[in-house]
Amino acid sequence: MAKKSMIAKNKRPAKHSTQAYTRCEKCGRPHSVYRKFKLCRVCFRELAYKGQIPGVVKASW
């Protein structure tokens, strides 16, 4: 879980475009965030298994 200060800092606009980085909307994790869903891989997996992300199905081939 991210510190509240880091989450608040991330919500402010960055001074330069290269300073901006993505954080998970659910838990605040800064690494391995899927931009399309704004979720980290851990939260994405949990919500996908529960069926709470529309259009996401388990791969089978």
Swiss-Prot record:
Q: Give the cofactor note.
A: Binds 1 zinc ion per subunit.
Q: Which cofactor does it need?
A: Zn(2+)
Any Gene Ontology CC annotation: small ribosomal subunit
Q: Which GO terms describe its biological process?
A: translation
User: Which SUPFAM superfamilies is this protein grouped with?
Assistant: Glucocorticoid receptor-like (DNA-binding domain) (SSF57716)
Q: Which GO terms describe its molecular function?
A: rRNA binding; structural constituent of ribosome; zinc ion binding
Can you state the subunit structure given in the record?
Answer: Part of the 30S ribosomal subunit. Contacts proteins S3 and S10.
UniProt function note: Binds 16S rRNA, required for the assembly of 30S particles and may also be responsible for determining the conformation of the 16S rRNA at the A site.
Q: What PANTHER family is this protein classified in? A: 30S RIBOSOMAL PROTEIN S14 (PTHR19836), SMALL RIBOSOMAL SUBUNIT PROTEIN US14B (PTHR19836:SF26)
Q: Which HAMAP family match?
A: Ribosomal_uS14_2_B
Q: What is the protein name for this chain?
A: Small ribosomal subunit protein uS14
Q: Which organism is it from?
A: Streptococcus uberis (strain ATCC BAA-854 / 0140J)
